[in-house]
């Protein structure tokens, strides 16, 4: 299947997820984000130039929260959100040199209670307070002093977060 830019999904796929409207989102590492609308049977290419290549260096994770806000990791040291299906990307942190995820490989994004986003990375688990734009490290080292690789996170309740 070809997209609106006459490109198919040809590169490493990082994630496939759905949204509240029944659409399917495919995040590729270096090509684009694709949206498949099952009602219209159309594949739409987002975040790429007219040649079908990604406008950014590399994409990581994408997550739709309960309000259908899209959260995206572009692997440039920042997190982004979009309330209009990736038409507009808003950085969580201002472009003032504060790049708390610079050099990180983000494995999982999970919005949580108290206006926080939980971020699993290859060096641990971090909590981003979206109100005051602060980052708190929750897990970083194991008993032997090695980095903790957090690939998956899930809430059991508002007060209990599981990481693996």
PLM regions and their residue ranges:
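Carboxylate-rich, polar loop motifs that coordinate divalent cations or form catalytic acidic clusters
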Residues: 1-164
């Amino acid at each position: 299947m070809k997209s609106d830019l006459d490109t198919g999904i040809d590169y490493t796929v990082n994630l496939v997820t759905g949204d509240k409207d029944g659409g399917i989102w495919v995040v590729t590492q270096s090509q684009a984000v694709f949206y498949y609308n099952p009602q219209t049977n159309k594949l739409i290419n987002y975040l790429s130039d007219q040649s079908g290549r990604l406008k950014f260096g590399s994409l990581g994770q994408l997550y739709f929260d309960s309000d259908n806000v899209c959260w995206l990791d572009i692997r440039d040291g920042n997190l982004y959100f979009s309330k209009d299906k990736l038409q507009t990307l808003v950085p969580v942190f201002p472009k003032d040199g504060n790049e708390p995820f610079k050099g990180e490989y983000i494995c999982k994004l999970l919005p949580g209670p108290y206006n926080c986003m939980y971020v699993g990375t290859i060096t641990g688990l971090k909590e981003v307070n979206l109100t005051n734009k602060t980052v708190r490290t929750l897990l970083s080292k194991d008993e032997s002093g090695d980095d903790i690789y957090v690939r998956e996170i899930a809430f059991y309740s508002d007060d209990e977060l599981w990481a693996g």
